[in-house]
Amino acid sequence: MLIKLLTKVFGSRNDRTLRRMRKAVSLINAMEPEMEKLSDDELKAKTNEFRARIEKGESVESLIPEAFAVVREASKRVFGMRHFDVQLLGGMVLNDRCIAEMRTGEGKTLTATLPAYLNALSGKGVHVVTVNDYLAQRDAENNRPLFEFLGMSVGINLPGMPAPAKREAYAADITYGTNNEYGFDYLRDNMAFSPEERVQRKLHYALVDEVDSILIDEARTPLIISGPAEDSSEMYKKVNKIIPHLIRQEKEDSDTFQGEGHFSVDEKARQVNLTERGLVLIEELLVQEGIMDEGESLYSPGNIMLMHHVTAALRAHALFTRDVDYIVKDGEVIIVDEHTGRTMQGRRWSDGLHQAVEAKEGVEIQNENQTLASITFQNYFRLYEKLAGMTGTADTEAFEFSSIYKLDTVVVPTNRPMIRKDLPDLVYMTEAEKIQAIIEDIKERTANGQPVLVGTISIEKSEVVSRELTKAGIKHNVLNAKFHANEAGIVAQAGYPAAVTIATNMAGRGTDIMLGGSWQAEVAALEAPTEEQIAQIKADWQVRHDAVLAAGGLHIIGTERHESRRIDNQLRGRSGRQGDPGSSRFYLSMEDALMRIFASDRVSGMMRKLGMKPGEAIEHPWVTKAIANAQRKVESRNFDIRKQLLEYDDVANDQRRAIYTQRNELLDVSDVSDTINSIREDVFKETIDAYIPPQSLEEMWDIPGLQERLKNDFDLEMPIAEWLDKEPELHEETLRERILAQSIEVYQRKEEVVGAEMMRHFEKGVMLQTLDSLWKEHLAAMDYLRQGIHLRGYAQKDPKQEYKRESFAMFAAMLESLKYEVISTLSKVQVRMPEEVEAMEMQRREEAERLAQMQQLSHQDDDAAVAADLAAQTGERKIGRNDPCPCGSGKKYKQCHGRLS
């Protein structure tokens, strides 16, 4: 009550921010007559004038009124479009490191030209981030004439572009691209073997369109560049045959693992657990299939990989549904983005889940992958000096933007008042009753000539509604992941009188629905339209437009509530743009996933008390409130998951930054010999310490062991025993110095043969390759640590602190291994002539190019980990402590990855 009173007196924080910015808008408006008087050349010259002022020390912020006035005037001349005052406000919000919430149809694309131009003046580059390639290309081409008129260059960053084209795109003043491509380029740059292979500049200013979709919905999705691990497709097929014999428990009891069924499903956490009965049955079936020996347990250490296969297969069957989570097309399993309803070609689930789904669907099983480099969007976008974003729906997530990205959310007012009617939800007992009610509503609306957009949350649901509409004889268009090729055409004409369009999640569609349809699309369909034809098309459109306005504008039907209120608001936001009339209503049933998991008992009880008859709906503020609370619960849970993921990923992020900084410094220098010499001293000191403890008696020395180690690991034949026999007075310090001097001498002889320049080149290559190889193994080890760290909670230890402590110890061990591996490799290398070295370098470059083209894999799960090659090998056979480590380091297992197990 008190807060409401204070807000009334002083205004909200949002009001105060806008009040401050409106003063600048008045200044910009006052400059308009002055700008109109300038010739085109004088207006263009303003860009160079601004750049010169910045170079002299003037701040970018001080240029806002003039720069925005210049862009507005240029837009009038190039596009015939003048920025509204609210768009100027939006531009200032975006320059202010904030999230601008601007409603659909308020011209976010044109608004973005203001801060993009302003921040590009410094010459450091601006990255405009969109959710898909189509929008990146469309926005870049639409805005290119304006930016080029003002003397700014525009680049487009698309997947599959060759490195020179990417470098050119990044060198432009303003670059358009997708969040995925910016992230993957960052990872690829940090896998480059020469400075020339890198494409990105320093990350300066990112302007993110549909910011909620990228920074929140996809925050749990790490970007991963992966390489193939070993083939285990047969095992997936064998385990897949067993799963249909298992029965799901009717009442879920994931805490005690007791019950009548063989496995329980936790739909909230998206996890599957075997019950005790299920474990007994699956062990029997595995023995029958000859996969496991009689008397063995599925939980024994030797069967860890088998347990991994069983869990993946169970999840594939119990949690992942065809035409909801994925589609099968041309013999391939393609993931469907749960937030946008789009297919994600080339993306694969990790942890063997994708292979398990392929086995379930009977398509070809592709190899598992091993992580080579990864980063989450949360950490990638925090690398920018300055970050801002815009969306139609951000206010519900304002707390998350503030706490994770330190971005305030500012709601920008609409240019015209919003007059859409949002009708209360209708709740039915069953799915069938709900669908029938939707069909009746559509019949009624279309009879009056009102266009209807039906939003569904999955392909499966959109096809159910489509079948019912076909039965009822209602013409309609379906827009989902299966038919996305003609997406823009369908959306453009969704405002036609009496048009019915069914669409899976409308988030990120990026195309406005014009009432009466799009006359521009009709003109574009003609080969060479005449002035008369265009005039006739416009006149016909005006008649249709007026008819739709009279019928009440676009009507939105939601077939069920989404987990997030924000995505419901996005669907509603397709109607009522720019002050147009419109309406919306959600139809729900007690069988909907959200209602079943979160709101069922309370609302079901309420409906029973009211004595509901079949086909009757409940429409009450209490129900709407209960549903909103259920959505808040889910949002809160998802926020906690993202926050926790970030806390864990921050540990890896600190290590990633340290490694990438070191790697970039290494790339930028041509001579690393000082580093090599320093490392050599450390490595030989530690090696000798292991056999000749410092300040120890000679009786404690293990000279044969030291000689063998020097021979095996450094290819050095040193008669240390002979030296000691011939020179009894040889003490420890002198002996150490002699061993180091001998090793340097042998190395220098190699350098004389191959030449100093070639040796420097080779040293740098060895350091980079060794660093990459160890970092790859470290990522796999971190994944395994992350998977099991929660169990430390049972020992009354804080899993996060344990994870930090152990991952730091692993990181320190990796750096020690790096020193050792580099010196060992350089010592053991066989000297070749320069021509041979060049040929080897050529081969390495080809391999690096192949690696860069490798499949890019994305996790879908909250904290899913990657099944790495090393684990696959160690899981299948017992490795002796003194055997060579399977990672290929050349060290004994106990001295390498045996320490981790």
Curated annotation (Swiss-Prot):
This protein's GO CC annotations: cell envelope Sec protein transport complex; cytosol; plasma membrane
Documented EC number(s): 7.4.2.8
Superkingdom in the source lineage: Bacteria
Cofactors named for this entry: Zn(2+)
GO molecular function, one term: ATP binding
Residues annotated for Zn(2+) binding in this entry: 885, 887, 896-897
Keyword field: ATP-binding, Cell inner membrane, Cell membrane, Cytoplasm, Membrane, Metal-binding, Nucleotide-binding, Protein transport, Translocase, Translocation, Transport, Zinc
Reaction catalyzed: ATP + H2O + cellular proteinSide 1 = ADP + phosphate + cellular proteinSide 2
Quaternary structure annotation from Swiss-Prot or TrEMBL: Monomer and homodimer. Part of the essential Sec protein translocation apparatus which comprises SecA, SecYEG and auxiliary proteins SecDF-YajC and YidC.
Protein purpose: Part of the Sec protein translocase complex. Interacts with the SecYEG preprotein conducting channel. Has a central role in coupling the hydrolysis of ATP to the transfer of proteins into and across the cell membrane, serving both as a receptor for the preprotein-SecB complex and as an ATP-driven molecular motor driving the stepwise translocation of polypeptide chains across the membrane.
HAMAP family on file: SecA
Protein name: Protein translocase subunit SecA
The species this protein was found in: Salmonella enteritidis PT4 (strain P125109)
Gene: secA
